Amino acid sequence: MVKVGFIVEGDSEKVLIESAGFKKWAGSQGLEICSPVINAKGGGNLLPHHIKPMLAQIERSQPDHIVILTDLEDAADVETVKARITTEHTNLIFIAVKALEAWFLADTDAMRRWLNAPEFFETAPEQTPGMPWDRLKEVAKAHGSRGPGSNKVIFAKKMCGVALRYELDRAAAHPACPSAKAFRDGLVALGGMPWS
């Protein structure tokens, strides 16, 4: 097994990486998720001088690779974010375009379960007019479902839990969610096992 340490932007990303479903998927790819998953508590903390103490904490688990997962939020493009947080100690930096919630929108099966709407399909989860969190509220209202609530972490736990069963593979398979695909493919490459 290839040991992978994670530094994530916030609580929702931490929920995803620590979820049983994600760990099971990672194991099937020859990856072991190191503990703890480090929460930077905001994209502004993902700067080289802030990352060094986080790296010291994660290196106790002796990872083979260190991965950073963050959101684009309002940055101009992915390269701007990478340039801001690049450090020689991390192997891969992945950016969820706009926000992690776009990946939830891209998992059609989990969204259909949440909305109880078998016809649901989000055509452009990474190109929502506003932030993906706002889009989740809109689609819930349009389908007469309860919204995601006011707490992103609670919603992330619900999406990644046993009832809705969010899966990275399904989000990555969405034709308009290239950031989830890049994340999945990058992790698969680290594990060295052929993607199935």
Where in this protein do the model-derived segments appear?
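C-terminal accessory helical subdomains adjacent to catalytic cores in phosphodiester-
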Residues: 1-3, 12-40, 45-196
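RNase H-like, metal-dependent nuclease domains and their acidic two-metal-ion catalytic environment used
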Residues: 6-8
